[in-house]
Amino acid sequence: MFFKKVKKADLEAVSSRNADQERQENKMMRAWISFGVVIILLILLFFASINIGSLKVGFGELLSGLFVKYNKDVATIYDLRFPRIIISMLAGAAIAVSGVLFQAVLKNPLADPGIIGISSGASFTAVIITAFAPTLYFFTPIAAFAGGVVAFFMVYCLSWKGGLSPMRIILTGVAVNSLFTGLSSALNSMSGGDRTGVAAIVEANITQKTWDDVTTLLPYVVAGLFLAMLFTQECNLLSLEDKTARSLGVNVNVTRIVISLVAVLLASISTAVAGAISFLGLIVPHIGRILVGSNHKMLIPFSAFFGAFT
């Protein structure tokens, strides 16, 4: 009788392990399918966006005009539409991954570069350069990054009270966001510089963007996404209690600051070039967790693709 009970318990344990393994395999399958669908949709969106407007070309004509023989219509699309499409995709990817990193660092599911004031801080310093020193346009991304860092540490310090409270972070972030948004509006009204450039930053308008803006944005976004992928394991560990993370060998404070700087870089640079984009960094990570899970090794690259699509 005793051996029958032991055998039954062993069979139940094996059955439970098999069920868990099957669930994990199903999750991984769903994650890879989600990756494939988003990548396909992103490619389709890219080619569909090329033909949005009065000027339209076929796919074969586009390839021929790009690589074989000069075509006036294709050249126009290449000069005008390609930069806007690429900038919107790069900025979307950067903002989405920035949201993932902020939510991991702050342990707050509502953390978003726009909500907690990072985008408005970056926008403010970018507006200063654009409005009063347009000849220093090359330094706009650096100025935006500095503004984003200042905004982040304002939120971090003002919301700290024996620890980080999600509610205090959001309330402080809203206040910092309002402060920098008001300052940007004031600078816009009193500046004598490039009003169009200032409006483009504040309103996220990419209609005037060129290949120069692409070359400005691309290296920063690629570097930021590469750094984000280097910290996937740390992001997973930061989701644990700080004591647990420290016991696993993580220097919590230093790791939190470094990952925050990567998130600020992504959000600030995209804001400087494409303008302030709200809620993308909030929504995309949550959709990503539903589709691919909470493991940042999957969540970060998926959010980049889905943010570019969105």
Q: Where on the chain are the PLM-derived regions?
A:
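Alpha-helical transmembrane segments in inner-membrane proteins
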Residues: 2-310
